[in-house]
From Swiss-Prot:
Modified residue annotations for Phosphothreonine: 196
UniProt function note: Cyclin-dependent kinase that phosphorylates the transcription factor ETS2 (in vitro) and positively controls its proteasomal degradation (in cells). Involved in the regulation of actin cytoskeleton organization through the phosphorylation of actin dynamics regulators such as PKN2. Is a negative regulator of ciliogenesis through phosphorylation of PKN2 and promotion of RhoA signaling.
Subunit structure: Heterodimer with CCNQ, the interaction is required for kinase activity. Interacts with ETS2. Interacts with PRK2.
First-tier enzyme category under EC: transferase
Protein name as it appears in the record: Cyclin-dependent kinase 10
One record GO biological process: negative regulation of cilium assembly
Pfam families noted in UniProt: Pkinase
Subcellular location: Cytoplasm, Cytoskeleton, Cilium basal body
Organism of provenance: Mus musculus
Length: 360
């Protein structure tokens, strides 16, 4: 058992062998972790699934980092399990297109924990809202290839992100795109264990999740990839639903009504009988993107397969002829530079809830 004396700044631990407490020396109380005092907070840049994020400077190295404060407000018994999952996953992940967890640092009285992450100057949601002109198709391909490479690495390591969206895709000044915010991520195995369907931001949520499946595979990430690709191409969200019922209806309007023929097991999903789906026999992707090449439409259709077992994998996408035809993907270092919105503005108190691109 531990006691913290806030007035004297002392931490006392109860001795097991002898009655009473002993004081932990200041030089030992943080263990191997550094103190957050060694970082200068520059400004608040956002709010992830389970914590506030700051731009900060490491006073020892002068490096600019992202400092994510772990939410502890609802916890009485230590670190939230969601944060433990995120820390555990990120510590084992090392890939150019995955945000890097550099270290974990602690607050003054050990009551707060911060994740020190690699800093990226932009997030795609802010870019899409503030860009004077949309990304070119060559730039979209450059972004998507990086997203897919990072995702292929995750899936090969048996990890599902479960919250892919444009606001969780970061970009450095050198055009390197990194997937961030692993607060909802899960490791999976065989057989696949049941998981809650209430994951993935609504606009990017796969139909099987909307219909209540608890069997989650990497295919839910791939549906979100399709939504992201379409959003980058159109410069606006593809399926901006306001409720789960509305979201399903938007999907049906775009892709047609699902059936047992194209999606075996569809009628047995937990919520399939609760929705009265409109009869819509047509796939309208081509009408939505009349200028897109046949290869581009094939890729979108592959990502938007109703049947999760038939949906494109990250490997399938990386081999797509869409990325091999003109306009070819530009090199990351040739991506345009933009004003540093994350450096200059303090993020709103509920950034995800207020952003036009980050609603439910």
């Amino acid at each position: 058992m531990a006691e913290v004396d806030l007035e004297s700044d002392q931490i006392r631990l109860k001795c097991i062998r002898k009655e009473g407490f002993f004081t932990v020396p200041p030089e030992h109380r943080l263990g191997r972790c550094r103190s957050v005092k060694e970082f200068e907070k520059l400004n608040r840049i956002g709010e992830g699934t389970y914590g506030i994020v700051y731009r900060a400077r490491d006073t020892q190295t002068d490096e600019i980092v992202a400092l994510k404060k772990v939410r502890m407000d609802k916890e009485k018994d230590g670190i939230p399990i969601s944060s433990l999952r995120e820390i555990t996953l990120l510590l084992r992940l090392r890939h150019p297109n995955i945000v890097e967890l550099k270290e974990v640092v602690v607050g003054n009285h050990l009551e707060s924990i911060f994740l020190v992450m690699g800093y990226c100057e932009q997030d795609l949601a802010s870019l899409l809202e503030n860009m004077p002109t949309p990304f070119s198709e060559a730039q979209v391909k450059c972004i998507m290839l990086q997203v897919l490479r990072g995702l292929q690495y995750l899936h090969r390591n048996f990890i599902i992100h479960r919250d892919l969206k444009v606001s969780n895709l970061l970009m450095t000044d050198k055009g390197c795109v990194k997937t961030a915010d692993f607060g909802l991520a899960r490791a999976y195995g065989v057989p696949v264990k049941p998981m809650t369907p209430k994951v993935v931001t609504l606009w990017y949520r796969a139909p099987e999740l909307l219909l209540g499946t608890t069997t989650q595979t990497t295919s839910i990430d791939m549906w979100a990839v399709g939504c992201i690709l379409a959003e980058l191409l159109a410069h606006k969200p593809l399926l901006p639903g306001t409720s789960e019922i509305h979201q399903i209806d938007l999907i049906v309007q775009l892709l047609g009504t699902p059936s047992e023929n194209i999606w075996p097991g569809f009628s047995k999903l937990p919520l399939a009988g609760q929705y009265s789906l409109r009869k819509q026999p047509y796939n309208n992707l081509k009408h939505k993107f009349p200028w897109l090449s046949e290869a581009g439409l094939r890729l979108l259709n592959f990502l938007f397969m109703y049947d999760p077992k038939k949906r494109a994998t990250s490997g399938d996408c990386l081999e797509s002829s869409y990325f091999k035809e003109k306009p070819l993907p530009c090199e990351p270092e040739l991506m345009p530079t933009f004003p540093h919105h994350r450096n200059k503005r303090a993020a709103p108190a509920a950034a995800e809830g207020q952003s036009k691109r980050c609603r439910p």
